[in-house]
Structures are given as structure tokens and as C-alpha cells.
């Protein structure tokens, strides 16, 4: 802590980690990550780890939002193409879903994941409470996928619906139905209530099926609809209300 004299007395400058924690932004440990990631600025300059500031006289911001003010909640839907990873940044330099959010000035974060080879509906928001609710297993949020597979496709829907574990972890039975079949290819609708890593791909592998295309078309009350591939839109008030319903 540094004491600094001013015309009206002595003010205290404190480490940014402590100030962010005291303002309820995050824990002190998490604040270190915010600072090193360049998410914190002081008087318009990117903050440095260990830097001190005075919240009464310095303009301290996190993700562009002044300290002590809640950012406006933003909710949007992206039709994610293949080839993009579902992260805010990628150490390997791969394309991320954030590269597709042109025109979005508020920092948002993906709710859950779609793997790099999958496509379809991805929800992004800065509403931490809603994110926690949608991802918590106790809420069993349903997600629907269109899955194109090849291999022994006869009775594939029945076989997939009988899978009870992936990589040794128990799962709820998926709701699977055949939409179309021709030769050794089939298009399936698969509804799951969990989000284990590559769950549907691993279920298919157990049944000797190769996944040719995996597209999420619905999550909870949100439907992908006709949103073009690679494009995004803000959620409607009705959609937001539906997500927040218990």
C-alpha cells in the first residue's frame, strides 16, 4: 500500500488485485489472470501485475467497464462453422469463435463448447449466473444435434440410445431417432442432457459409426433456425426469458 499526499489529505493506493477483489469482480488470484491477460486498464493504459492504483482518483476498468459498475448483460447466438475452437484465445494460434463476433463491443464468453470439427448453435454471454445455471449438471439442459454417420447404420438409433457410459463415465440415455438413411449413411437426431467431452462422437465410436457431420440445432429453448453459418445475432427478450426460467 502506498500513501500519496493530495491537496485534501492523504489517499491510499493499493494493488489492483485487492481492489478488484474488494469490488466483487473476482478473487485476488483470478485478478492476477485478468491483469496478465490485459483485461484491466488504469487511466487508459493496460495494467501491469503488481501495479497500484487509487479507486477514487484513477480510472480503473475491467473489460472496458469502470470498476464498481456492472456491465450490461449481453446474450447472443452464433452459428459456429467447423475449424474454429470454442475459446476466447488459443495459444496455438488457431481460429477461435471470437474471430466471428465482428461488431460486438462487449466482452462475452462461450457457454459450454462445440469441438473444432463440430458446428451449429453456440450461446455466448457475459451473464455469469446464467452460464453457471446452464452448465450445472443438476439443471439437465437438453441439447439437440443433427448427426450424419456412416458404417453399420441399421438400428443405429437403437444402439446409440443404449449407450450408458463414455470413457468409463456414466451418462443418461440419449434420445435418438433416425431422420433418414441411404446405403451405409444415416442422419440422426440426438438429444443429450449432459456435456461430456466429445460425448456424441464417443458414443458413435462405441457403435462402430463414423461421424461425418455434427451440428447442434437446439439448446434448451434456443433453436438455430435459419441463422447463416458463421453469423451471429442477439437473442430476443422472449429467448432470454426462456433461458432464465426454472
What is the predicted function of each stretch?
Residues 3-246:
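Basic, flexible Lys/Arg- and Gly-enriched helix-loop patches that mediate nucleic-acid binding at interfaces
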Amino acid at each position: 500500500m502506498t500513501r500519496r499526499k493530495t491537496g485534501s489529505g492523504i489517499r491510499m493506493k493499493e494493488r489492483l488485485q485487492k481492489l478488484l477483489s474488494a469490488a466483487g469482480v473476482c478473487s485476488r488470484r483470478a485478478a492476477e489472470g485478468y491483469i496478465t491477460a490485459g483485461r484491466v486498464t488504469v487511466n487508459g493504459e493496460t495494467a501491469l501485475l503488481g501495479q497500484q492504483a487509487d479507486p477514487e482518483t484513477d480510472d480503473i476498468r475491467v473489460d472496458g467497464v469502470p470498476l464498481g459498475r456492472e456491465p450490461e448483460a449481453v446474450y447472443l447466438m452464433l452459428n459456429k462453422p467447423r475449424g474454429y475452437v470454442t475459446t476466447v484465445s488459443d495459444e496455438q494460434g488457431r481460429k477461435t469463435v471470437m474471430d466471428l463476433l465482428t461488431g460486438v463491443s462487449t466482452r462475452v464468453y462461450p457457454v459450454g463448447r462445440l469441438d473444432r470439427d463440430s458446428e451449429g448453435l453456440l450461446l455466448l454471454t457475459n451473464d455469469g449466473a446464467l452460464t453457471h445455471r446452464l452448465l450445472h449438471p443438476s439443471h439437465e439442459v437438453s441439447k439437440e444435434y443433427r448427426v450424419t454417420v456412416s458404417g453399420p447404420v441399421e438400428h443405429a438409433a437403437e444402439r446409440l440410445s443404449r449407450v450408458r457410459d463414455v470413457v468409463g463415465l456414466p451418462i443418461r440415455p440419449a434420445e435418438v431417432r433416425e431422420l433418414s438413411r441411404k446405403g451405409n449413411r444415416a442422419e440422426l437426431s440426438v438429444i443429450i442432457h449432459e456435456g461430456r467431452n466429445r460425448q456424441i462422437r464417443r458414443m458413435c465410436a462405441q457403435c462402430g459409426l463414423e461421424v461425418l457431420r455434427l451440428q447442434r440445432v437446439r439448446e434448451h429453448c434456443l433453436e438455430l433456425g435459419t441463422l447463416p453459418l458463421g453469423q451471429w445475432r442477439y437473442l430476443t427478450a422472449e429467448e432470454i426469458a426462456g433461458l432464465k426460467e426454472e
